[in-house]
Design a protein with these regions (language model features):
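Buried hydrophobic packing segments
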Residues: 28, 58-62, 156, 174-181
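A short, small-residue-rich loop immediately preceding and capping a beta-strand
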Residues: 41-55, 72, 189-195
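C-terminal structured "cap/appendage" subdomains that terminate the fold
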Residues: 160-194
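Active-site/ligand-binding loops adjacent to catalytic centers
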Residues: 1-12, 16, 36, 64-69, ...
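Short glycine/serine/threonine-rich phosphate/pyrophosphate-binding segments
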Residues: 48-59, 82-84, 171-178, 200-203
Length: 213
């Protein structure tokens, strides 16, 4: 038996995990209609992507919408600025490979062996990604990018300063992308970021890097 905590691996595990996390987007849809009376015309849903379970759950109810109305943006772990290692197979040109019983984009060496990854976020430090996200990338339904460790830390500092949130380092990657693109957007664009984890699990890392938690 396998115990899988993300939308990775053989199809049945992807289905089970995807079914359970889809509740996130069901709730979001209700909240949007309550806030705006309808689904707004310009929405960007930004989520971090490691294995990809929270991103799929966040997007599930919106995948069939036109991407001009609902844009799906996944943010992978770009690793430290000065390192060549990362955990961003979708946004850094990884090739198709086999890992944990599934075909997906994987960080590999020239011989097809799985490469070492590096990220400040343990939750994003995975050398592959859900086959669902590979499909969304290939069909251009979702856009994938990455944030470096430094960008994620800066985003964490900004969010905790101005919002009543204490996000873990995983969603801090998503916040980093939101901060990067926000100044370029029209005023009627709705940005929604899934703050999918609490920083209490990263407190030792944050103390080491920022001197406080």
């Amino acid at each position: 038996h396998m115990c899988v905590g993300s939308t990775v691996g053989p199809n049945i595990f992807v289905k089970i995990c995807g079914w359970s996390t889809a509740q996130i987007s069901k709730e979001l849809k209700i909240q949007l209609k309550k806030e705006f009376k309808t689904i707004p015309n310009k929405v960007k849903l930004i989520n971090c992507v490691g294995g990809g379970s929270s991103a799929y759950g966040f997007w599930s109810e919106f995948i069939d919408y036109d991407k001009k109305q609902i844009e799906l943006i996944g943010v992978e772990a770009g690793g430290p600025k000065k390192s060549k290692l990362h955990a961003a197979p979708l946004s850094k040109g990884a090739k198709l490979g086999i890992l944990h019983g599934a075909a997906a984009y994987c960080c590999q060496d020239n011989e097809g062996q799985i490469k070492e990854t590096e990220s400040i976020s343990a939750g994003l430090d995975y050398p592959s990604v859900s086959p669902i996200h590979c499909f969304l990338k290939d069909t251009k339904r979702a856009r994938y990018t990455y944030a470096t460790d430094e960008a994620a830390l800066n985003a964490y500092k900004m969010v905790t300063k101005f919002e009543k949130l204490n996000p873990s380092l995983e969603p801090s990657h998503a916040f980093a992308e939101a901060i990067r693109i926000a100044p370029k957007l029209s005023k009627d664009t709705i940005l929604i970021i899934n703050s999918c984890g609490d920083a209490i699990k990263d407190r030792d890392i944050l103390k080491g890097r920022l001197g406080k938690y």
